């Protein structure tokens, strides 16, 4: 099964290559072929070129945005790119700043068989935002529960099937 990990980056190349190194050291079974797509959001700092070979990562590609467009646009661009140009079964967008734990990839991969092509959502357990952000976020969750009756735990850290990516691209979700 081919897995594409999408990592947006703006200037923080050191963190991205640290994350890739951590992904490389995960105990991933041979059932999965891991590739990384870095989406460079028009960084104005020089990229740290790592010529290191990663034995558990099949390939690393860098897509360069022409201008800085932000994290969400980078993920959307990466998803569109892999849908149109790459062979894959699932995509995992990740933050390159260390907020998403690479160990959770193992949990995603375990859940793929039972996911029925539905998105698998990771929940951040460690947040580094300030107190005001956390209070507002809790208020947002309370309002959501009040109006929908459901607790929605969602972030960018997801595992998306190719079918889900296709729907997102075709329907411009």
Regions found by a protein language model. Give the residues of each.
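Hydrophobic targeting segments
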Residues: 2-8, 16, 23, 34-39
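Short, well-ordered alpha-helices that flank and scaffold nucleotide-derived cofactor binding pockets
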Residues: 21, 25, 80, 84, ...
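Residue-level recognition of the N-termini of beta-strands and the immediately preceding loop/turn
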Residues: 3, 32-36, 60, 89-94
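Short helix-capping segments at alpha-helix termini
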Residues: 27-32, 54-59
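Short, well-formed alpha-helical segments that are part of the catalytic scaffolds
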Residues: 12-27, 46
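A conserved acidic beta->alpha catalytic loop
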Residues: 40-49, 98-99
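Acceptor/aglycone-binding surface of glycosyltransferases and processive sugar-polymer synthases
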Residues: 66-67, 71-81, 90-93, 99-173
């Amino acid at each position: 099964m081919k897995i594409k990990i999408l990592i947006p980056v703006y200037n923080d190349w050191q963190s991205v290559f640290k994350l890739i190194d951590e992904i490389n050291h995960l105990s991933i079974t041979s059932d999965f072929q891991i590739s990384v797509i870095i989406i460079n959001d028009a960084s104005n700092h020089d990229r740290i070129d790592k010529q290191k070979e990663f034995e558990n990562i099949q390939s690393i590609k860098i897509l360069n945005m022409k201008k800085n467009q932000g994290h969400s646009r980078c993920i959307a661009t990466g998803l569109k790119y892999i849908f149109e140009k790459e062979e894959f079964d699932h995509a995992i967008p990740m933050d390159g700043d260390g907020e998403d734990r690479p160990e959770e990839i193992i949990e995603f991969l375990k859940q793929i068989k039972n996911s029925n092509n539905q998105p698998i959502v990771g929940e951040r357990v460690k947040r580094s935002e300030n107190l005001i952000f956390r209070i507002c976020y809790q208020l947002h969750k309370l309002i959501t529960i009040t109006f929908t009756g459901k607790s929605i735990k969602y972030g960018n850290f997801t595992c998306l099937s190719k079918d889900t990516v296709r729907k997102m691209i075709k329907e411009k979700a």
